[in-house]
Amino acid sequence: MYTIEQIKEVIPHRYPFLLVDRILEVEEGKRAVGIKNVTANEEFFNGHFPDYNVMPGVLIVEALAQVGAFAVLKMEQNQGKLAFFAGIENCRFKRQVVPGDQLRLEVELTKLRGPIGKGRATATVDGEVACTAELTFAIK
C-alpha cells in the first residue's frame, strides 16, 4: 500500500489536481488499484453543482489515468519521467459519484510499446461500476 506522500514521489500531480488518496495494489508495468475518497470539501463541487454535488466525469477519468500513470512510472526504466494522458476510447459513465463515496480505481495495462501504452480502466463505488474507459498514455 502507498500513502499520499509516496504517491507524490512517483507522479507529479498536486492539490487540487491530485485525485488519488492511496494506492492499494501495484504490479509495476501491469496494473494498479487506488482509491479516491470523495468529500463535500472538493473544490470542484463549488461549481459542479452547488445544489446537487456530482463529481465531474472527466475527473473520474483523470483519477483513473493517475492510477495508470503510477503503475507505469513505478517501472525502473520510467522512474523520474512523466506520463501524459494521450487519449481515451469507449468511455462510459454508469453511476453518479457524490460526496461520501469512495472510488475504487483499477487500471490494467494492456499494451506497452516504447513510450506509448494503453490501459483498461474501471472506477467503482461499493462494487457498482461508475465508469469504464480505455486510456492511452505517452511517457516522456
UniProtKB/Swiss-Prot annotation:
Keyword Transmembrane helix part of the UniProt annotation: no
SUPFAM superfamilies: Thioesterase/thiol ester dehydrase-isomerase
Catalytic activity: a (3R)-hydroxyacyl-[ACP] = a (2E)-enoyl-[ACP] + H2O
One Pfam match: FabA
Signal peptide: none
Keyword vocabulary terms for this entry: Cytoplasm, Lipid A biosynthesis, Lipid biosynthesis, Lipid metabolism, Lyase
GO-annotated biological processes: fatty acid biosynthetic process; lipid A biosynthetic process
Gene Ontology CC, one term: cytoplasm
UniProt-recorded name of the protein: 3-hydroxyacyl-[acyl-carrier-protein] dehydratase FabZ
Active-site residue numbers: 48
Naturally occurring in which organism (per UniProt): Exiguobacterium sibiricum (strain DSM 17290 / CCUG 55495 / CIP 109462 / JCM 13490 / 255-15)
E.C. code: 4.2.1.59
InterPro entries: FabA_FabZ, FabZ, HotDog_dom_sf
UniProt-annotated location(s): Cytoplasm
The keyword Lyase belongs to this UniProt entry's keyword annotation: yes
Physiological role: Involved in unsaturated fatty acids biosynthesis. Catalyzes the dehydration of short chain beta-hydroxyacyl-ACPs and long chain saturated and unsaturated beta-hydroxyacyl-ACPs.
